[in-house]
Amino acid sequence: MIYVSISTIPARIKNLNQSVQSLLNQTQKPDKIFINIPFKYKRFSETISDDQIPKFDNSIVEITRCEDCGPGTKLLGSLNKFEKNSLVILADDDHIYEDYMIEKFFYFYSKSPNNAY
């Protein structure tokens, strides 16, 4: 399985759609993209309500509401959903990815699955 895990903060929720679309447009498709969004942030007074979260008409994208673990939220928010021995790619919500990014990670992962990149 290939998972992409991402989180966002209130100041960047409006740009999340572009980043996720670039992940959906990959030459090597992920099996699942988890978007981890805390119910409440420890570092910010703002929150993200359900109606602020972009809707993705795609079964690959799953919104995970979770506790805020700071920068670790992008991994820890969905950690219990990963199958063992899977490729997990941590992505940023403010970046548009080249369409070959997942393909390249998968290539190197398949050569050395015990390494981190």
Predicted regions and their residues:
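A short acidic, amphipathic alpha-helical/loop segment
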Residues: 18-22, 77, 103-105
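Conserved donor-nucleotide/metal-binding helix-loop-beta segment in metal-dependent transferases, i.e.
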Residues: 100-117
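Eukaryote-skewed repeat-based solenoidal scaffolds used as protein-protein interaction platforms
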Residues: 79-82, 95, 101
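Short beta-strand-to-loop acidic/aromatic patch adjacent to the donor-nucleotide binding site
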Residues: 85-96
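N-proximal low-complexity "stem/linker" segments adjacent to membrane-targeting elements
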Residues: 1-25, 34
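Active-site-proximal specificity loops/subdomain of glycosyltransferases
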Residues: 36-86
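Short, acidic, metal-binding catalytic loop of nucleotide-sugar glycosyltransferases
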Residues: 19-31, 39-40, 55
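Short, conserved active-site loop motifs that form the nucleotide-linked donor/cofactor pocket
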Residues: 2, 59-61, 114-115
